[in-house]
């Protein structure tokens, strides 16, 4: 954004997003950990306005400078996802995905990991359904798969994931350490 606006905004953006620059780390309770891309984009506009730009100028700068990283390049599998999902599928366990990411990058990752055949349904942040920690993503997935939330397991790596699962009445809510949250937070 500095190249587009001439304003040094790195520190302000990192503070607003919940990114600790010195450790190169996303903070577990920060906006970057579980916020939809649209919300992060709007926050960027607000940060630019706080730097003295008008709403129109801030929107133009963000429009010109906004860049979404390639999800396939940035994604890291924490296990052999195909083998895990294949095994769950063989056990007749349905898999639904509720993500704070947008649909296009999520679909690209699913295709890159070659797991499309195992995903029964997914809800993404740009689907128009209230996002985490609201229960709506889980309840929507359960409705689509024709199961009661009390029969569902929600697995997540952020506190927003776990709050969403509990709010939806999931039968089991499991925190995993594959994301930015520490065990004490989950």
Q: What role is predicted for each listed range?
A:
Residues 3-67, 79-83, 87-90:
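A metal-dependent, Asp-based hydrolase signature
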Residues 60-65, 72, 81-111:
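Substrate-recognition element of Asp-dependent hydrolases with the DxDx(T/V) motif
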């Amino acid at each position: 954004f500095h190249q587009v606006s001439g304003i040094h905004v790195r520190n302000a953006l990192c503070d607003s997003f919940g990114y600790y620059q010195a450790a190169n780390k996303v903070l577990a309770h920060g906006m970057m950990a579980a916020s939809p891309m649209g919300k992060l984009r709007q926050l960027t506009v607000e940060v630019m306005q706080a730097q003295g730009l008008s709403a129109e100028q801030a929107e133009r700068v963000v429009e010109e400078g906004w860049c979404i990283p390639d999800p396939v390049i940035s994604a890291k599998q924490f296990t052999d996802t195909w083998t895990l999902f294949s095994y769950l599928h063989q056990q007749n366990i349905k898999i639904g995905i509720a993500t704070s990411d947008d649909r296009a990058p999520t679909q690209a990752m699913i295709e890159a990991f070659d797991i499309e055949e195992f995903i029964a349904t997914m809800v993404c942040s740009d689907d128009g359904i209230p996002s985490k920690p609201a229960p709506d993503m889980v309840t929507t997935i359960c409705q689509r798969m024709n199961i009661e939330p009390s029969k569902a397991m929600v697995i997540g790596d952020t506190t927003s994931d776990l709050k969403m699962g509990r709010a939806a009445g999931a039968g089991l809510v499991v925190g995993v350490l594959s994301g930015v949250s520490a065990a004490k937070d989950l």
